[in-house]
């Protein structure tokens, strides 16, 4: 099931990022102590009452010296392309400016619902100032104060009225859904075409020519798969040409629907920061992951080339040390037979459950090998461990003091669980809870 998406749009200095941070709260920072994952604050998840949604802060756009109208056009374009609902932000202290009118005209051209938020209404006396904003043509303006957190609930109530109905996907549980993510032109569509052996999507050397995400059902050795293709950036307008950071937006909806994510990188161009950022979203979403090095045919090779490249991948993707690596050439259709065994393994491990009795034996042995940490004369005690979820496998440790379960010791326990049970291809979530 795909969560609805809200985009916050408006001219500069109306408080878009403040409202974004109010809505997402502490959810923005998820894996601060995980090396290699840089957190991009322009896209996050939010919750309001019974609703879960994704939210885009278009204030994060950085187009350098581009004229104002180009920046706003870029913001509106992202919102119109990616969002189910648009929150149009204006500044209640300034009244309607020419720039607000420009944004309004752009949003009128879209068929997306627009909710008008009038920010910086910091006290009840200022509410009289909002009525002029009716003239923008988007119905009732909602007075809000980002700095004081006022009116956000009413704004989200209105936005939620426009969320599309959520439909459960009609694929069987044993079907493996996987997506291919990566920056533009690493060969995602070419990989799907090579696997299927037919031209089911548009393939072009120009980034962004795949029209929409395309689900393709495919059977291989009696296992049914659903492949979700996402093209990274669409070639529509300035922002998609000006910055690659928005390629993550195209990937995120596909990640959400997947069991297994193939992180595709370009052997010829090597690994760049954008690759790590996109992979980080799949990791944070708790999906099973296979790293696919495409265009392997373009690399001059000797007996050590693959090992050297694998070492480079491990160095750059330290947070994906559990993910297997496949080296393929979509163009030459070589080594593609290595993909499905890895997808199957990652998918199976993502759903794997282990017996509590065996798990606790492993943890007991681990503690005997490396005793738990101490603090001010007190030692961390792990009373009991149990697996509480799959996709990804999630383990709860009942302890005497949650604060003493340091990241480094948690990492050690994760490694011992992996050594005992495998779990290659899937992240593991470890949670410490105080025993009552």
UniProtKB/Swiss-Prot annotation:
One Pfam family from the record: KH_dom-like
Entry binding sites for GTP 2: 182-189, 229-233, 294-297
Residue intervals of the KH-like domain: 352-436
Domain EngA-type G: 4-167, 176-351
Domain of life (superkingdom): Bacteria
One annotated GO biological process: ribosome biogenesis
Residues bound to GTP 1: 10-17, 57-61, 119-122
GO molecular function: GTP binding; ribosome binding
Entry keyword set: GTP-binding, Nucleotide-binding, Repeat, Ribosome biogenesis
Stated family: Belongs to the TRAFAC class TrmE-Era-EngA-EngB-Septin-like GTPase superfamily. EngA (Der) GTPase family.
Subunit (UniProt): Associates with the 50S ribosomal subunit.
Role of this protein: GTPase that plays an essential role in the late steps of ribosome biogenesis.
Protein name: GTPase Der
Source organism (scientific name): Macrococcus caseolyticus (strain JCSC5402) (Macrococcoides caseolyticum)
High-level lineage: Bacteria, Bacillati, Bacillota, Bacilli, Bacillales
Recorded name of the encoding gene: der
């Amino acid at each position: 099931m795909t969560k609805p998406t809200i985009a916050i749009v408006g001219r500069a200095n109306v408080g878009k990022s403040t409202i974004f941070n109010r809505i997402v709260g502490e959810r923005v920072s998820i894996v601060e102590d995980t090396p290699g994952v840089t957190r991009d604050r322009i896209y996050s998840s939010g919750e309001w009452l019974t609703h879960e949604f994704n939210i885009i802060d278009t204030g994060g756009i950085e187009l350098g010296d581009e004229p104002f109208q180009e920046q706003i056009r870029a913001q509106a374009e992202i919102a119109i392309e990616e969002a189910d609902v648009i929150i149009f932000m204006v500044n209640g202290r300034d009244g309607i400016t020419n720039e607000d009118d420009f944004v309004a005209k752009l949003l009128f051209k879209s068929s997306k619902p627009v909710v008008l938020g009038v920010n910086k209404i910091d006290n009840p006396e200022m509410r009289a100032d909002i009525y002029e904003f009716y003239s923008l043509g988007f119905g009732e303006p909602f007075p809000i104060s980002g700095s004081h957190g006022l009116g956000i609930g009413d704004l989200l109530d209105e936005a939620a009225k426009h969320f599309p109905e959520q439909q459960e996907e009609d694929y069987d549980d044993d079907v493996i859904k996987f997506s291919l993510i990566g920056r533009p032109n690493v060969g995602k569509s070419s990989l799907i075409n090579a696997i299927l052996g037919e031209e089911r999507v548009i393939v072009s050397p120009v980034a962004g020519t795949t029209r929409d995400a395309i689900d393709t059902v495919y059977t291989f050795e009696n296992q049914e798969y659903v492949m979700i293709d996402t093209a990274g950036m669409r070639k529509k307008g300035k922002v998609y040409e000006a910055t690659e950071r928005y390629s993550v937006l195209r990937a995120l909806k596909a990640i959400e629907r997947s069991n297994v994510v193939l992180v595709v990188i370009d052997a010829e161009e090597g690994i760049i920061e954008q690759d790590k950022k996109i992979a980080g979203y799949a990791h944070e979403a708790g999906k099973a992951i296979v790293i696919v090095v495409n265009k392997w045919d373009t690399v001059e090779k000797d007996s050590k080339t693959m090992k050297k490249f694998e070492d480079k991948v491990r160095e750059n993707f330290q947070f994906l040390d559990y993910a297997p690596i496949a080296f393929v050439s979509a163009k030459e259709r070589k080594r593609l037979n290595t993909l499905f065994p890895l997808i199957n393994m990652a998918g199976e491990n993502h759903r794997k459950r282990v017996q509590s009795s065996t798990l606790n034996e492993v943890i007991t042995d681990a503690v005997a090998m490396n005793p738990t940490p101490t603090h001010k004369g007190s030692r961390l005690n792990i009373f009991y461990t149990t697996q509480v979820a799959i996709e990804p496998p999630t383990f709860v440790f009942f302890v005497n003091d949650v604060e003493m379960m340091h990241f480094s010791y948690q990492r050690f326990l994760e490694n011992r669980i992996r050594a005992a049970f495998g779990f290659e291809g899937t992240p593991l979530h470890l949670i410490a809870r105080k025993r009552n």
